[in-house]
Amino acid sequence: MGVKGREPSFVHHGSSDEGEPVGEFHYGSASDPQVLEPGKGIKTFLTDPPYNLGFDYGPEVDDKQPEEDYHQMMEDVFDACYEAADDDANLFIIHYPQDLAKMWPRLTKKWKFHQWITWAYPANFGHSSKRWTNASRTILWLVKGEPEFYGERVVQPYRNPTDKRIRKLIHEEGNIGTSLYNWWVVNLCKNVSKDKRDYSNQIPEELL
């Protein structure tokens, strides 16, 4: 799935690089044995694999493989993720739903299904005279063991903040919003986006 990427980066709690380390982020190829070393204890995998649609990612990625070869590659990578994962871990896969359906037995061979999340985005391309415009992808959430969930850390604003019950939650209990739905509307990262970097198919920062 590409050549080895740059060195990992580390995230620390607090404003400096001397605080408690809370995250280690790796970039690049999942085939790098140092990234997916068995027993490494990784807590979360956030993946956006090539979709095998013939997209030009550059010379390091083959995005047009025979379907069986592609499915086997995906199985091998996510099996390696499982072996490198902590006893309680999350795996998120961003992909198109029809392709995830084809690979379902492979994806859930070791990992356990947890939730199906839909990422919807406005799109002015891909229109068809035979079907509705495709303007969404799936974020498949798989788990190993029983990872902790901190849903209260990412919330959406209340839709009726003037309601008496909601006002109490806001002003007396300090709540700033309610739980997210299992569908998220997030714009694509385009060439004019503020968070755009030198990458051919970048996932929007808000989604991450």
Explain the meaning of each model-derived region.
Residues 1-6, 10-207:
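Core catalytic lobe of class I
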